[in-house]
Amino acid sequence: MQGNPLVVEVGQVAKQANGATVVRYGDSTVLTAAVMSKKMATGDFFPLQVNYEEKMYAAGKFPGGFMKREGRPSTDATLTARLIDRPIRPMFAEGFRNEVQVINTVLSYDENASAPMAAMFGSSLALSISDIPFNGPIAGVQVGYIDGEFIINPDKEQMEASLLELTVAGSKEAINMVESGAKELSEDIMLEALLKGHQAIQELIAFQEQIVAVVGKEKAEVELLQVDADLQADIVAKYNAQLQKAVQVEEKKAREAATEAVKEMVKAEYEERYAEDENLATIMRDVAEILEQMEHAEVRRLITEDKIRPDGRKIDEIRPLDAVVDFLPKVHGSGLFTRGQTQALSILTLAPMGETQIIDGLAPEYKKRFLHHYNFPQYSVGETGRYGAAGRREIGHGALGERALEQVLPSLEEFPYAIRLVAEVLESNGSSSQASICAGTLALMAGGVPIKAPVAGIAMGLISDGTNYTVLTDIQGLEDHFGDMDFKVAGTREGITALQMDIKIAGITPQILEEALAQAKKARFEILDVIEATIAEPRPELAPTAPKIDTIKIDVDKIKVVIGKGGETIDKIIAETGVKIDIDDEGNVSIYSSDQAAINRTKEIIAGLVREAKVGEVYHAKVVRIEKFGAFVNLFDKTDALVHISEIAWTRTTNVSDVLEVGEDVDVKVIKIDEKGRVDASMKALIPRPPKPEKKEEKHD
């Protein structure tokens, strides 16, 4: 635990919840409360809700905005809630339909002790000690990789230096959730990292088991969703053959139509048969569930026994691929990637660094330069549905693509732009998040972003009966829905840049992980072949519509000169030239415009503002003021110098105004700059000194 104590407190707070814990990890403190509804929900899914609530007081901060109160969850909070939900969800019994809520509240925040990992530990423990029928415990850890060594739960400094940012969770027996970004690491290193993480998980689970043995409650007896056995036997006998035939239709829409026709026929028959039965609603619910189970069983049987996939592909075969660049005019870059019936359009936008997103959460405020947003409209699957703000799934898929592509982006010094990619899923039959990564690569290269290497992504699946298993390459929607695993792998030819794994069973073995990673590598290379055949490398120039950029370096103490009082000077420059200007704390000035002449003019203005007089240099100056003791001349911009009366000429000057007048141009040489920055100049230093007159010899009589 990197020297941070892990302390668990039970029984002091939130005692009316089914289970509650306070987990103190370092100085991070998380309260987790788990509650369960008394009755089974009416829906056809398990209604589990996991929240991760960031309270700004935990970091000693005021919330932003007018209301000064926490609002909707941040992106990080949403991703953390998903991170906890995913390993917990498979640990409930099939048919369990009671609503369960797991609420994690961050009460104190320590950036060197992961609050999300404390929340995951607390979520598992709160469920385990409660009467909620949870088949845990589970635990999760973060894994870093520095100088060939794996580090469990690295602190902030270590994570910044790490080549790997991996979160892995699981039960005592197996891993059941993975989320990772990596700097092109090999499959062997990633597999070893997962196994190292699982060893640490087993220790944390042993700790939980000790606590559960002392304070755990007896699990409640709850009703599980079970169908009527006689009804099931009747439907299977009559209609299984027809449904099997429908499932084997290869094209998605045709298959959906065929299976739906069989289901509607069955529902109509049984609705008519039991129309007068007072339990009609329950019967029809069972009919729908039986049909779902029949389709589920047939898809899995085809794959495991006949080695036939619903669309006729081989186990390790990728759907037909197509890659297009420059799909859109005017934008800064675009790429259209199609894999079978999954299609994503990615659009690139470049902007000045002033457009970076400011992230103000529990961690210290920072700026985010690269954004990857993922949109999944309902028309992509031929359905109507909700439109509005991005949901948890869209946020999660966007973050996965962001991790995958971020690893190959040029540094800020190499490419001083803010970068935004938007993935529009136009058609979906599984693996749309991986299509968005491929489309993003196309858009970046088409837009002239000098990425280190193209990135491709692939989704792997699994069908397992507990003894035998089959790993699938490039899963489609039906295989994802009825399968046991969704394992997404993205990377370059050099190595992996992102992983994400979710499973519906208790866990998977190292052997399955190794096989899935090997198949994914082969598939990734095939996809990269198609991408590189379309565009082999990033274009050497940006799109004509993209903002041009130039940079100059100024001294840090000159930043205030360029900005001016209240931003007056920089605003005046922007108004005059029409450019955008960003200045960082180190004096790097970035100038953005589509007009190169405007950039050049801005550089001249700024260079003049920060220019400093130097002793020994000669300037063509203008007299701006005359005093009895000398004349003030303007060297450049706002820099004036004093030419003392004694420095005007080698001969004695009685009256300055007899020699100089305001507005006159003169050449001067800087001879002195004092500690206060006051400049003394000389005119006579540029004039040859006249020879001294010869002394007349005295004559003596």
UniProtKB/Swiss-Prot annotation:
Against CDD domains, the record matches this protein to:
KH-I_PNPase, RNase_PH_PNPase_1, RNase_PH_PNPase_2
One term of GO molecular function: polyribonucleotide nucleotidyltransferase activity
EC identifiers of the protein: 2.7.7.8
Q: Which InterPro entries does the UniProt entry name for this protein?
A: ExoRNase_PH_dom1 (IPR001247), ExoRNase_PH_dom2 (IPR015847), ExoRNase_PH_dom2_sf (IPR036345), KH_dom (IPR004087), KH_dom_type_1 (IPR004088), KH_dom_type_1_sf (IPR036612), NA-bd_OB-fold (IPR012340), PNPase (IPR012162)
Q: List each copy of the KH domain by range.
A: 547-606
Q: Where is the composition biased (Basic and acidic residues)?
A: 691-701
| Major place of residence | cytoplasm
> What catalytic activity is recorded?
RNA(n+1) + phosphate = RNA(n) + a ribonucleoside 5'-diphosphate
Instruction: Note the coiled coil stretches, chain numbering.
Output: none
Which Gene3D superfamilies does this chain map to? Answer: GHMP Kinase, N-terminal domain, K Homology domain, type 1, Nucleic acid-binding proteins
Keyword list (alphabetical) reads: Cytoplasm, Magnesium, Metal-binding, Nucleotidyltransferase, RNA-binding, Transferase
Q: Where is each S1 motif domain found?
A: 616-684
Look at the named UniProt entry and state the broad enzyme category this protein falls under: transferase
Q: Which cofactor does it need?
A: Mg(2+)
What are the subcellular locations of this protein? Cytoplasm
> Which SMART domains does the entry mention?
KH (SM00322), S1 (SM00316)
According to the record, the signal peptide region is none
Q: What are the start and end residues of every segment in region (Disordered)?
A: 682-701
Q: Which Gene Ontology BP terms does the record give?
A: mRNA catabolic process; RNA processing
Q: Name one GO cellular component term.
A: cytosol
The UniProt transmembrane annotation reads none
NCBIfam families with a match to the protein in the record: polynuc_phos (TIGR03591), PRK11824.1 (NF008805)
Q: Which PANTHER family match?
A: POLYRIBONUCLEOTIDE NUCLEOTIDYLTRANSFERASE, POLYRIBONUCLEOTIDE NUCLEOTIDYLTRANSFERASE 1, MITOCHONDRIAL
What is this protein's function per UniProt? Involved in mRNA degradation. Catalyzes the phosphorolysis of single-stranded polyribonucleotides processively in the 3'- to 5'-direction.
Entry protein name: Polyribonucleotide nucleotidyltransferase
The gene that this protein is the product of is pnp
